Amino acid sequence: MGTMVHIVEGTHHTYKNFFTKEECDHIISIFERDKDIVPYGTDTGYEGLTSTYSEYNWLYNKDIQPLNIPQRLFDLDYFSDWEYMVVQCWGNALHVGEELKEHYHGEIMEEHFRRMYFINCNIFLGGEYNKTWYKDIGYTHNEPGDLHLFSCELDHRVDHNIGHNTRYSMALDIYPDSNRMLMLPDKHMSRYSIHKRPII
């Protein structure tokens, strides 16, 4: 299903204004509205909104779907030769003093996706503290709507939030192989979503 996609180690691209400021504010409002009703993971090693990644995909949220995020990803030049993408999408809300320790996304527990190269995206949504550290480029300052796209072996982190408000971002893991999605146990279907490039 689909054509073979080769993901190069060390891939890292930045796209400005993937979301508008208004869209970022909208997503933040949905995160805040629904944070107490979405399922949370209990053994992810993370707390708060980040821990929902193992149980819930925000692309299924009826108030985020109108943003048509999968189509907008297909429209990025990096994905120009992708026919399918399997997407996991979650939110991060770092309150004052909280952090995301250095990590990379290639070390995953799901057997169906293990040993498979894939793409990560971080989209900064808002907050006074806007720095992210990536192993290849060091610290970068983000504006609301900025998207960083990078291969899954790249270490990255967010240091302690020293701003005066909560820092919000959206994260996505994006896989090119839809066949593996079809083999997933039903219990994971709420975690991943499959998308096909629209025929124009």
State what each model feature region is.
Residues 81-188:
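Catalytic core of non-heme Fe(II) oxygenases with the double-stranded beta-helix
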